[in-house]
Amino acid sequence: MGTRLKVLRVFKQLQRTRMDVFKDDDIALKAARLKINEEFRKNRNETSEENINEMIKLGSNVETVLRESVLQMEHVGEDKLLLRPRKSLLLENVPYCDEPRKKS
């Protein structure tokens, strides 16, 4: 696949992830869009294949961190925050046992 297509794919992945991660938060959506666009514009004239591949890898890593690590919270009172996790971040709850298992 051409380098140009790889760059475009990472750009689109970042934009889609931004829309999912910061859903219903207009300020964060706009800030993320501006930052993504700024970084891609800043490196628009890069010609070194090695540097481009490194930046593609960095963009993919950033997208993964956003998708897997960022949680939305909103202020609902003076000292209260409402956590709004996405379904992809929820893990299966495994019961905790205080006693060690008996060997059979």
Swiss-Prot record:
Protein keywords: Chaperone, Mitochondrion
One annotated GO biological process: mitochondrial respiratory chain complex III assembly
One GO MF term attached to the UniProt entry: protein folding chaperone
Compartments it resides in: Mitochondrion matrix
Coiled-coil regions, chain positions: none
Any Pfam family the entry gives: Complex1_LYR
Main location: mitochondrion
Gene Ontology CC terms: mitochondrial matrix
InterPro entries from the UniProt entry: Complex1_LYR_dom (IPR008011), Complex1_LYR_LYRM7 (IPR045298), MZM1/LYRM7 (IPR050435)
Subunit record text: Interacts with UQCRFS1.
Function: Assembly factor required for Rieske Fe-S protein UQCRFS1 incorporation into the cytochrome b-c1 (CIII) complex. Functions as a chaperone, binding to this subunit within the mitochondrial matrix and stabilizing it prior to its translocation and insertion into the late CIII dimeric intermediate within the mitochondrial inner membrane.
Family: Belongs to the complex I LYR family.
Full protein name: Complex III assembly factor LYRM7
Gene transcribed to yield this protein: lyrm7
